[in-house]
């Protein structure tokens, strides 16, 4: 990987080691989630998969742990991506695969938690029916259907993911239209990549995938310069020649907006002004001849310094792609709202029934475990969906939009943190699982010290036999 100084010498980028506080917090959450979640989920997989008898409950939580374990495996890539300030060194295959795994885990986890809630509700309301129909085979079939539905819902992530290289810097992006990158996936740190947009350029929010801090990087090599920001892309030639490109907004998990400045380019058709000038060979040529009159029309007056800050967060009219709306609201409704309604309804019915029916202590603990798991899931995922919806409608260039983008790294990290909570909840609240873990650890120690234990065991057995024989003789 190239060093910061090497990148600066080759492209004119000025990288600095400082990170935004929100970025540091997000990396800390991701790191803690990986350190705790990977061994925790691995232990649950080992115990529940190999040491415990197959029941309906173990099937539910075993599949849930598989989803969390796979998500934990992807966290180092996310941490490195944040540390590299948006640079994507892993290639296009992982650009498609890693975000797909994250969304796959999101849908699988929420569907499995919903199934657990429904299962417990049926056990309380319909105990006789459950006794006749509730079995391990049915639970496995339901889990298989859940994985299949989750896979179908994450297909758009895999299909539309692409890598985009700009000045030797590869970025992981979503591309909804041929030849045009609708939004970039990750953000750049303003202090690291550059110092904002040139004064003559008016930048408007665009569409990009991963929402994050307002930042930009700028290169000034050759006859033209490129400024890629969290919200927009603008290509500029020296001497006031400026062309506004299709906007692109760095966002998170499918929240992005497309806003194009409706500027008349003095005779140039409006639709031609919306072409991707980064891929326009004529524009990149230094021999492009533009008349003085056209140059005057192409230049944009410099706005006041606080022009954008004074605008309302909802000032601009956003044009959101239809596919973006489908993806965003599908995740919100199918992956959050409907499951939450089902969970709340199930536990409400359980509470009402428990008022009239006496519940044994073990059932109380199992119910408490499920409720805590669901509550933590909601706490982890609610900020992610709330931030995503707000970013669709709030101008990212406003103070409110900038604040949302700054803290969205934290909301994404918090959503990933849900993967490490479940195994520790099992250990704290599940007595049977704690017992199995102790037995498994004892087995490891016995295998490591098999010779000594064998001798000790033989001695104990011999002593017990002699005592028994002596007792029988005395009688």
From Swiss-Prot:
InterPro entries: Anaphtx_C3AR1 (IPR001644), Anphylx_rcpt_C3a/C5a1-2 (IPR002234), Formyl_rcpt-rel (IPR000826), GPCR_Rhodpsn (IPR000276), GPCR_Rhodpsn_7TM (IPR017452). Residues 1-23, 81-96, 161-331, 392-408 are extracellular. Residues 47-57, 119-139, 352-368, 430-475 are cytoplasmic. Its main location: membrane. GO terms for cellular component: plasma membrane. Gene3D superfamilies: Rhodopsin 7-helix transmembrane proteins. Pfam families: 7tm_1. This is C3a anaphylatoxin chemotactic receptor. It comes from Cavia porcellus (Guinea pig). The gene is C3AR1.
């Amino acid at each position: 990987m190239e060093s910061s100084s090497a990148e600066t010498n080759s492209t004119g980028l000025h990288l600095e080691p400082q990170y935004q506080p929100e970025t540091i917090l997000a990396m800390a959450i991701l790191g803690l989630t990986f350190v705790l979640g990977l061994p925790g989920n691995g232990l649950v997989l080992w115990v529940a998969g190999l040491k415990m008898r197959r029941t309906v409950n173990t099937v539910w939580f075993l599949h849930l742990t598989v989803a969390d374990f796979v998500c934990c495996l992807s966290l180092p890539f996310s941490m490195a991506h944040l540390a590299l300030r948006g640079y994507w060194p892993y290639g296009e295959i992982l650009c498609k695969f890693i975000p797909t795994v994250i969304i796959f885990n999101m849908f699988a986890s929420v569907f499995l938690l919903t199934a657990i809630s429904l299962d417990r509700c049926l056990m309380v309301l319909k105990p006789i029916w459950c006794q006749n129909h509730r079995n391990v085979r049915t639970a496995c079939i339901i889990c298989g259907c859940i994985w299949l539905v989750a896979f179908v819902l994450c297909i758009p992530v895999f299909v539309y993911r692409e890598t985009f290289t700009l000045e030797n810097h590869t970025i992981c992006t979503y591309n909804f239209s041929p030849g045009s990158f609708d939004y970039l996936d990750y953000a750049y740190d303003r202090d690291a990549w550059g110092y904002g947009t040139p004064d003559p350029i008016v930048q408007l929010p665009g569409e990009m995938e991963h929402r994050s801090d307002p930042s930009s990087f700028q290169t000034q090599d050759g006859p033209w310069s490129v400024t890629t920001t969290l919200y927009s892309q603008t290509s500029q030639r020296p001497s006031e020649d400026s062309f506004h490109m299709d906007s692109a907004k760095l966002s998170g998990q499918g929240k992005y907006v497309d806003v194009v400045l409706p500027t008349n380019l003095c005779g140039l058709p409006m639709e031609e002004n919306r072409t991707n000038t980064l891929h326009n060979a004529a524009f990149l040529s230094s021999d492009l001849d533009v008349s003085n009159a056209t140059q005057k029309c192409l230049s944009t007056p410099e706005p006041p310094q606080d022009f954008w800050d004074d605008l309302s967060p909802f000032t601009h009219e956003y044009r959101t792609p239809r596919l973006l709306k489908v993806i965003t609201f599908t995740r919100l409704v199918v992956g959050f709202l409907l499951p939450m309604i089902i969970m709340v309804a199930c536990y409400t019915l359980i509470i009402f029934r428990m008022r009239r029916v006496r519940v044994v202590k073990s059932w109380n603990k199992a119910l408490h475990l499920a409720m805590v798991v669901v509550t933590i899931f909601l706490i982890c995922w609610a900020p992610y969906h709330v931030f995503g919806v707000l970013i669709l409608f709030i101008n990212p260039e406003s103070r409110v939009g900038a604040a949302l983008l700054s803290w969205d790294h934290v909301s994404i990290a918090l959503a990933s943190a849900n993967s490490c909570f479940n195994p520790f909840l099992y250990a704290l609240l599940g007595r049977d699982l704690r017992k199995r873990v102790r037995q498994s650890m004892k087995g490891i120690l016995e295998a490591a010290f098999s010779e000594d234990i064998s001798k000790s065991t033989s001695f104990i057995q011999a002593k017990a036999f002699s005592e028994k024989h002596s007792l029988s003789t005395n009688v």
